[in-house]
Amino acid sequence: IGKRIFFENAGGALTLKSVVETSSKFAAIPDNQGRANTASKALMEIIQEAKKDAANLFGATTGQFFVGESGTELLFRLVRNAATSAKAGGNIVGSSFEHPATRSAAKYWAAQTGRQYMNVQHENNNGNVTAQLYSEIVNRDTRLVTILHASPVTGISVDLQAISKAVHSIAPEALIIVDGVQYAAHGGIKIDHYKIDGYAISPYKMYSRHGYGFAWVSDRLTQMSHEQLLDGPIESWELGTRDTGSYATISDVVKYLEWLGGKIENSESRSVKLSNAAKAIAAQEIALTDLMIHGEDNIKGLKDLKGIEIIGGQKNPDRKGLVSFRINGTSSHLLVDFLNEKGIRTHVRKADHYSGNILNPLGWEDCVRVSVCHYNSSEEIKSLLLALNEFQVDASIGQVNSN
Protein backbone atom coordinates (compact mmCIF):
# COMPACT_ATOMS: atom_id res chain seq x y z
CA ILE A 1 0.00 0.00 0.00
CA GLY A 2 2.76 2.42 0.92
CA LYS A 3 2.36 5.76 2.63
CA ARG A 4 -1.13 7.21 2.34
CA ILE A 5 -3.52 9.74 3.81
CA PHE A 6 -6.64 7.85 4.82
CA PHE A 7 -9.87 9.75 4.25
CA GLU A 8 -12.03 6.66 3.70
CA ASN A 9 -13.08 6.19 7.31
CA ALA A 10 -16.79 5.96 6.45
CA GLY A 11 -15.89 2.85 4.47
CA GLY A 12 -14.11 1.42 7.50
CA ALA A 13 -12.09 3.09 10.24
CA LEU A 14 -8.51 2.18 11.05
CA THR A 15 -8.33 -1.04 13.09
CA LEU A 16 -6.91 -1.01 16.60
CA LYS A 17 -3.79 -3.15 16.99
CA SER A 18 -5.38 -4.67 20.08
CA VAL A 19 -8.33 -5.80 17.95
CA VAL A 20 -5.99 -7.60 15.55
CA GLU A 21 -4.23 -9.33 18.45
CA THR A 22 -7.48 -10.24 20.20
CA SER A 23 -9.02 -11.65 17.02
CA SER A 24 -5.97 -13.81 16.38
CA LYS A 25 -5.93 -15.09 19.96
CA PHE A 26 -9.58 -16.12 20.03
CA ALA A 27 -9.47 -17.66 16.56
CA ALA A 28 -6.99 -20.19 17.98
CA ILE A 29 -9.24 -21.30 20.86
CA PRO A 30 -11.25 -24.46 20.03
CA ASP A 31 -13.27 -24.57 23.24
CA ASN A 32 -17.00 -23.87 23.09
CA GLN A 33 -19.21 -22.00 25.51
CA GLY A 34 -21.55 -23.66 27.97
CA ARG A 35 -19.24 -26.54 28.83
CA ALA A 36 -18.10 -27.76 32.25
CA ASN A 37 -14.47 -26.68 32.01
CA THR A 38 -12.36 -23.67 32.89
CA ALA A 39 -11.78 -22.56 29.29
CA SER A 40 -15.50 -22.54 28.55
CA LYS A 41 -16.20 -20.64 31.76
CA ALA A 42 -13.58 -18.05 30.83
CA LEU A 43 -15.16 -17.53 27.41
CA MET A 44 -18.57 -16.94 29.00
CA GLU A 45 -17.06 -14.43 31.42
CA ILE A 46 -15.37 -12.55 28.56
CA ILE A 47 -18.70 -12.27 26.71
CA GLN A 48 -20.49 -11.00 29.82
CA GLU A 49 -17.73 -8.48 30.50
CA ALA A 50 -17.96 -7.24 26.89
CA LYS A 51 -21.69 -6.71 27.28
CA LYS A 52 -21.04 -4.62 30.40
CA ASP A 53 -18.44 -2.63 28.46
CA ALA A 54 -20.94 -2.11 25.65
CA ALA A 55 -23.56 -0.87 28.10
CA ASN A 56 -21.12 1.84 29.18
CA LEU A 57 -20.21 2.69 25.60
CA PHE A 58 -23.82 2.88 24.41
CA GLY A 59 -25.17 4.55 27.55
CA ALA A 60 -27.68 1.75 28.11
CA THR A 61 -28.89 0.60 31.53
CA THR A 62 -31.63 -1.61 30.10
CA GLY A 63 -31.98 -3.99 27.16
CA GLN A 64 -29.31 -6.35 25.88
CA PHE A 65 -26.54 -6.65 23.30
CA PHE A 66 -25.88 -9.35 20.73
CA VAL A 67 -23.75 -9.96 17.65
CA GLY A 68 -24.71 -10.92 14.11
CA GLU A 69 -23.36 -11.21 10.60
CA SER A 70 -23.11 -7.44 9.99
CA GLY A 71 -24.72 -4.17 10.96
CA THR A 72 -27.00 -4.42 7.92
CA GLU A 73 -28.05 -7.98 8.76
CA LEU A 74 -28.87 -6.98 12.32
CA LEU A 75 -30.92 -4.00 11.17
CA PHE A 76 -32.88 -6.30 8.84
CA ARG A 77 -33.44 -8.67 11.75
CA LEU A 78 -34.54 -5.95 14.14
CA VAL A 79 -36.92 -4.45 11.56
CA ARG A 80 -38.28 -7.88 10.65
CA ASN A 81 -39.01 -8.86 14.23
CA ALA A 82 -40.50 -5.47 15.05
CA ALA A 83 -42.75 -5.56 11.98
CA THR A 84 -44.01 -9.08 12.61
CA SER A 85 -44.48 -8.56 16.36
CA ALA A 86 -46.21 -5.19 16.34
CA LYS A 87 -49.97 -4.88 16.48
CA ALA A 88 -51.55 -5.79 13.13
CA GLY A 89 -52.48 -3.09 10.65
CA GLY A 90 -51.27 0.47 10.61
CA ASN A 91 -48.21 1.69 8.74
CA ILE A 92 -44.42 1.73 8.79
CA VAL A 93 -42.53 5.03 8.51
CA GLY A 94 -39.00 5.65 7.28
CA SER A 95 -37.16 8.43 5.49
CA SER A 96 -35.40 9.11 2.19
CA PHE A 97 -32.39 10.08 4.33
CA GLU A 98 -31.72 6.46 5.26
CA HIS A 99 -29.15 3.94 4.11
CA PRO A 100 -30.77 0.95 2.35
CA ALA A 101 -30.09 -1.22 5.41
CA THR A 102 -33.19 0.11 7.18
CA ARG A 103 -35.02 1.51 4.17
CA SER A 104 -34.98 -1.79 2.27
CA ALA A 105 -35.95 -3.79 5.33
CA ALA A 106 -38.80 -1.45 6.26
CA LYS A 107 -40.25 -1.38 2.75
CA TYR A 108 -39.98 -5.15 2.38
CA TRP A 109 -41.63 -5.93 5.68
CA ALA A 110 -44.30 -3.32 5.17
CA ALA A 111 -45.29 -5.23 2.04
CA GLN A 112 -45.00 -8.63 3.74
CA THR A 113 -47.21 -7.55 6.65
CA GLY A 114 -49.78 -5.75 4.51
CA ARG A 115 -48.91 -2.29 5.75
CA GLN A 116 -48.40 1.00 3.94
CA TYR A 117 -44.84 2.31 3.86
CA MET A 118 -44.81 6.07 4.42
CA ASN A 119 -41.78 8.17 3.49
CA VAL A 120 -40.38 11.21 5.28
CA GLN A 121 -38.62 13.26 2.60
CA HIS A 122 -35.30 14.69 3.77
CA GLU A 123 -34.23 18.27 3.11
CA ASN A 124 -31.84 18.67 0.18
CA ASN A 125 -30.39 21.97 1.33
CA ASN A 126 -29.00 20.67 4.62
CA GLY A 127 -28.79 16.94 3.85
CA ASN A 128 -30.84 16.11 6.92
CA VAL A 129 -34.21 15.05 8.28
CA THR A 130 -35.88 16.59 11.33
CA ALA A 131 -38.37 15.79 14.08
CA GLN A 132 -40.82 18.19 12.45
CA LEU A 133 -40.65 16.30 9.16
CA TYR A 134 -41.28 12.99 10.94
CA SER A 135 -44.22 14.47 12.86
CA GLU A 136 -45.85 15.46 9.57
CA ILE A 137 -45.90 11.81 8.39
CA VAL A 138 -46.27 9.69 11.53
CA ASN A 139 -49.85 9.14 12.69
CA ARG A 140 -51.56 7.28 15.51
CA ASP A 141 -51.61 4.09 13.41
CA THR A 142 -47.83 4.02 12.92
CA ARG A 143 -46.46 0.72 14.20
CA LEU A 144 -42.77 0.97 13.34
CA VAL A 145 -40.37 3.83 12.58
CA THR A 146 -36.83 3.59 11.22
CA ILE A 147 -34.24 6.34 11.72
CA LEU A 148 -30.70 6.86 10.42
CA HIS A 149 -28.54 8.49 13.11
CA ALA A 150 -25.99 9.89 10.63
CA SER A 151 -25.69 9.61 6.85
CA PRO A 152 -22.63 8.04 5.19
CA VAL A 153 -23.39 10.19 2.14
CA THR A 154 -24.25 13.64 3.51
CA GLY A 155 -22.22 13.31 6.70
CA ILE A 156 -25.05 14.93 8.63
CA SER A 157 -26.49 13.56 11.89
CA VAL A 158 -30.06 13.86 13.16
CA ASP A 159 -31.44 14.85 16.55
CA LEU A 160 -32.43 11.30 17.46
CA GLN A 161 -33.89 12.18 20.83
CA ALA A 162 -36.11 14.87 19.30
CA ILE A 163 -37.34 12.58 16.52
CA SER A 164 -38.13 9.79 18.98
CA LYS A 165 -40.03 12.22 21.21
CA ALA A 166 -42.00 13.54 18.23
CA VAL A 167 -42.87 10.02 17.09
CA HIS A 168 -44.05 8.88 20.51
CA SER A 169 -46.09 12.04 21.06
CA ILE A 170 -48.22 10.90 18.11
CA ALA A 171 -47.84 7.11 18.23
CA PRO A 172 -46.88 6.14 21.80
CA GLU A 173 -46.64 2.42 21.04
CA ALA A 174 -44.59 2.74 17.86
CA LEU A 175 -41.38 0.71 17.80
CA ILE A 176 -38.24 2.59 16.72
CA ILE A 177 -35.21 0.96 15.09
CA VAL A 178 -32.06 3.04 14.53
CA ASP A 179 -29.15 2.63 12.13
CA GLY A 180 -26.11 3.85 14.07
CA VAL A 181 -23.49 2.47 11.68
CA GLN A 182 -22.11 5.81 10.49
CA TYR A 183 -22.68 7.71 13.73
CA ALA A 184 -20.97 5.34 16.17
CA ALA A 185 -17.36 6.45 15.68
CA HIS A 186 -18.15 10.17 15.67
CA GLY A 187 -20.18 10.96 18.78
CA GLY A 188 -21.27 9.58 22.12
CA ILE A 189 -24.24 7.20 22.01
CA LYS A 190 -26.88 7.65 24.73
CA ILE A 191 -29.43 4.86 24.41
CA ASP A 192 -31.18 5.72 27.67
CA HIS A 193 -32.00 9.19 26.32
CA TYR A 194 -33.51 8.04 23.03
CA LYS A 195 -36.44 5.79 24.07
CA ILE A 196 -35.94 3.46 21.11
CA ASP A 197 -36.14 -0.30 20.60
CA GLY A 198 -33.13 -1.22 18.50
CA TYR A 199 -29.74 0.27 17.61
CA ALA A 200 -27.13 -1.44 15.43
CA ILE A 201 -23.57 -0.64 14.40
CA SER A 202 -20.87 -2.13 12.17
CA PRO A 203 -17.80 -2.40 14.42
CA TYR A 204 -15.36 -2.15 11.51
CA LYS A 205 -16.44 1.48 11.25
CA MET A 206 -15.64 1.95 14.94
CA TYR A 207 -11.98 0.87 15.12
CA SER A 208 -12.76 -2.86 15.26
CA ARG A 209 -12.93 -5.30 12.33
CA HIS A 210 -15.10 -6.84 9.65
CA GLY A 211 -16.95 -10.10 10.22
CA TYR A 212 -19.69 -9.14 12.66
CA GLY A 213 -22.31 -6.57 13.55
CA PHE A 214 -23.30 -5.42 17.02
CA ALA A 215 -26.77 -4.49 18.23
CA TRP A 216 -28.71 -3.34 21.26
CA VAL A 217 -32.37 -4.30 21.66
CA SER A 218 -34.90 -2.99 24.16
CA ASP A 219 -36.62 -5.03 26.84
CA ARG A 220 -39.94 -4.09 25.24
CA LEU A 221 -39.06 -5.66 21.89
CA THR A 222 -37.49 -8.65 23.65
CA GLN A 223 -40.77 -9.36 25.45
CA MET A 224 -42.59 -9.43 22.12
CA SER A 225 -42.53 -12.47 19.88
CA HIS A 226 -39.16 -12.67 18.12
CA GLU A 227 -37.02 -15.22 16.31
CA GLN A 228 -35.35 -17.66 18.69
CA LEU A 229 -34.62 -21.33 19.20
CA LEU A 230 -37.62 -23.41 20.22
CA ASP A 231 -37.83 -23.97 23.97
CA GLY A 232 -34.81 -21.73 24.52
CA PRO A 233 -34.64 -18.76 26.91
CA ILE A 234 -37.39 -16.34 25.88
CA GLU A 235 -35.14 -13.31 26.29
CA SER A 236 -32.39 -14.60 24.00
CA TRP A 237 -31.57 -12.95 20.66
CA GLU A 238 -28.46 -14.98 19.99
CA LEU A 239 -28.76 -17.79 17.46
CA GLY A 240 -26.08 -20.46 17.63
CA THR A 241 -22.61 -20.33 19.10
CA ARG A 242 -21.33 -16.83 19.74
CA ASP A 243 -17.96 -15.61 18.50
CA THR A 244 -16.19 -14.73 21.72
CA GLY A 245 -13.56 -12.83 19.76
CA SER A 246 -16.20 -10.46 18.40
CA TYR A 247 -17.36 -9.56 21.89
CA ALA A 248 -13.77 -9.25 23.12
CA THR A 249 -12.94 -6.74 20.40
CA ILE A 250 -15.82 -4.53 21.59
CA SER A 251 -14.03 -4.45 24.93
CA ASP A 252 -10.86 -3.42 23.08
CA VAL A 253 -12.71 -0.46 21.57
CA VAL A 254 -14.04 0.60 24.96
CA LYS A 255 -10.58 0.34 26.53
CA TYR A 256 -9.14 2.51 23.76
CA LEU A 257 -11.80 5.18 24.25
CA GLU A 258 -11.24 5.05 28.01
CA TRP A 259 -7.53 5.61 27.40
CA LEU A 260 -8.29 8.50 25.07
CA GLY A 261 -10.70 10.09 27.54
CA GLY A 262 -8.14 9.66 30.30
CA LYS A 263 -5.76 11.86 28.33
CA ILE A 264 -8.32 14.66 28.49
CA GLU A 265 -8.95 14.46 32.24
CA ASN A 266 -7.43 12.33 34.98
CA SER A 267 -10.54 10.59 36.28
CA GLU A 268 -11.27 7.17 37.78
CA SER A 269 -14.79 7.21 36.34
CA ARG A 270 -15.28 5.14 33.21
CA SER A 271 -18.35 7.14 32.18
CA VAL A 272 -16.43 10.41 32.54
CA LYS A 273 -13.56 9.09 30.43
CA LEU A 274 -15.89 7.80 27.71
CA SER A 275 -17.79 11.09 27.70
CA ASN A 276 -14.56 13.06 27.45
CA ALA A 277 -13.39 10.86 24.58
CA ALA A 278 -16.65 11.50 22.69
CA LYS A 279 -16.34 15.26 23.22
CA ALA A 280 -12.70 15.30 22.12
CA ILE A 281 -13.48 13.23 19.03
CA ALA A 282 -16.32 15.57 18.06
CA ALA A 283 -14.18 18.66 18.57
CA GLN A 284 -11.30 17.29 16.50
CA GLU A 285 -13.57 16.28 13.64
CA ILE A 286 -15.31 19.66 13.62
CA ALA A 287 -11.91 21.33 13.39
CA LEU A 288 -10.90 19.06 10.50
CA THR A 289 -14.08 19.49 8.46
CA ASP A 290 -14.09 23.25 9.09
CA LEU A 291 -10.51 23.43 7.83
CA MET A 292 -11.45 21.34 4.80
CA ILE A 293 -14.34 23.63 3.90
CA HIS A 294 -12.91 27.03 4.82
CA GLY A 295 -9.17 26.57 4.33
CA GLU A 296 -6.44 28.41 6.21
CA ASP A 297 -4.16 31.32 5.40
CA ASN A 298 -3.22 31.03 1.72
CA ILE A 299 -4.61 27.49 1.33
CA LYS A 300 -8.06 27.64 -0.23
CA GLY A 301 -10.83 25.58 1.31
CA LEU A 302 -13.49 23.71 -0.63
CA LYS A 303 -15.86 26.67 -0.56
CA ASP A 304 -13.33 28.84 -2.42
CA LEU A 305 -12.44 26.34 -5.13
CA LYS A 306 -14.04 26.91 -8.50
CA GLY A 307 -17.18 24.91 -9.25
CA ILE A 308 -17.28 22.96 -5.99
CA GLU A 309 -20.68 22.18 -4.46
CA ILE A 310 -20.95 20.70 -0.96
CA ILE A 311 -23.79 18.45 0.17
CA GLY A 312 -25.37 19.87 3.31
CA GLY A 313 -23.92 23.33 2.76
CA GLN A 314 -20.80 25.12 3.93
CA LYS A 315 -21.96 25.68 7.51
CA ASN A 316 -23.82 22.78 9.06
CA PRO A 317 -23.59 22.21 12.83
CA ASP A 318 -24.81 18.62 12.43
CA ARG A 319 -21.88 17.49 10.27
CA LYS A 320 -20.07 14.43 11.64
CA GLY A 321 -16.59 14.00 10.20
CA LEU A 322 -17.61 13.75 6.55
CA VAL A 323 -17.83 16.09 3.58
CA SER A 324 -19.25 15.05 0.21
CA PHE A 325 -18.83 17.38 -2.76
CA ARG A 326 -18.47 17.58 -6.51
CA ILE A 327 -16.73 19.84 -8.97
CA ASN A 328 -19.50 20.82 -11.36
CA GLY A 329 -18.71 19.51 -14.83
CA THR A 330 -15.95 17.16 -13.65
CA SER A 331 -16.23 13.41 -13.11
CA SER A 332 -15.83 12.52 -9.45
CA HIS A 333 -14.10 9.32 -10.58
CA LEU A 334 -11.43 11.41 -12.27
CA LEU A 335 -10.83 13.45 -9.13
CA VAL A 336 -10.66 10.40 -6.86
CA ASP A 337 -8.15 8.78 -9.25
CA PHE A 338 -6.06 11.96 -9.17
CA LEU A 339 -6.08 11.98 -5.36
CA ASN A 340 -5.17 8.28 -5.28
CA GLU A 341 -2.07 9.08 -7.31
CA LYS A 342 -1.18 11.61 -4.61
CA GLY A 343 -1.57 8.96 -1.90
CA ILE A 344 -4.85 10.42 -0.65
CA ARG A 345 -7.67 7.90 -0.22
CA THR A 346 -11.19 9.19 -0.82
CA HIS A 347 -14.27 7.56 -2.35
CA VAL A 348 -16.78 8.05 -5.14
CA ARG A 349 -20.46 7.81 -4.22
CA LYS A 350 -22.66 7.15 -7.23
CA ALA A 351 -26.38 7.65 -7.74
CA ASP A 352 -27.00 3.93 -7.23
CA HIS A 353 -29.00 1.91 -4.71
CA TYR A 354 -26.69 3.07 -1.93
CA SER A 355 -26.61 6.82 -2.58
CA GLY A 356 -29.24 7.59 -5.22
CA ASN A 357 -31.73 8.63 -2.53
CA ILE A 358 -29.42 11.56 -1.72
CA LEU A 359 -27.83 12.31 -5.10
CA ASN A 360 -30.81 11.96 -7.46
CA PRO A 361 -32.88 14.76 -5.85
CA LEU A 362 -29.85 17.01 -6.29
CA GLY A 363 -29.48 16.04 -9.94
CA TRP A 364 -26.00 14.66 -9.26
CA GLU A 365 -24.56 11.56 -10.89
CA ASP A 366 -21.81 11.18 -8.30
CA CYS A 367 -19.77 12.94 -5.63
CA VAL A 368 -16.46 12.68 -3.82
CA ARG A 369 -16.69 11.62 -0.19
CA VAL A 370 -13.95 12.67 2.22
CA SER A 371 -14.47 11.05 5.61
CA VAL A 372 -12.24 11.73 8.59
CA CYS A 373 -11.78 10.35 12.09
CA HIS A 374 -10.20 11.92 15.14
CA TYR A 375 -6.80 10.44 14.33
CA ASN A 376 -6.58 12.42 11.09
CA SER A 377 -4.58 15.64 11.25
CA SER A 378 -4.81 19.21 10.01
CA GLU A 379 -1.65 18.61 7.97
CA GLU A 380 -3.43 15.81 6.12
CA ILE A 381 -6.37 18.11 5.40
CA LYS A 382 -3.98 20.75 4.06
CA SER A 383 -2.38 18.13 1.80
CA LEU A 384 -5.83 17.33 0.43
CA LEU A 385 -6.60 21.00 -0.22
CA LEU A 386 -3.25 21.57 -1.94
CA ALA A 387 -3.90 18.53 -4.14
CA LEU A 388 -7.36 19.86 -5.06
CA ASN A 389 -5.83 23.23 -5.91
CA GLU A 390 -3.29 21.44 -8.10
CA PHE A 391 -6.07 19.47 -9.79
CA GLN A 392 -7.90 22.66 -10.68
CA VAL A 393 -4.74 24.31 -12.01
CA ASP A 394 -3.98 21.26 -14.16
CA ALA A 395 -7.58 21.21 -15.41
CA SER A 396 -7.42 24.90 -16.32
CA ILE A 397 -4.37 24.37 -18.54
CA GLY A 398 -5.74 21.21 -20.10
CA GLN A 399 -3.59 18.62 -18.32
CA VAL A 400 -6.67 16.96 -16.80
CA ASN A 401 -9.50 15.64 -18.93
CA SER A 402 -12.65 16.83 -17.16
CA ASN A 403 -15.02 14.68 -19.18
Task: List PLM regions with ranges.
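Pyridoxal 5′-phosphate
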Residues: 1-403
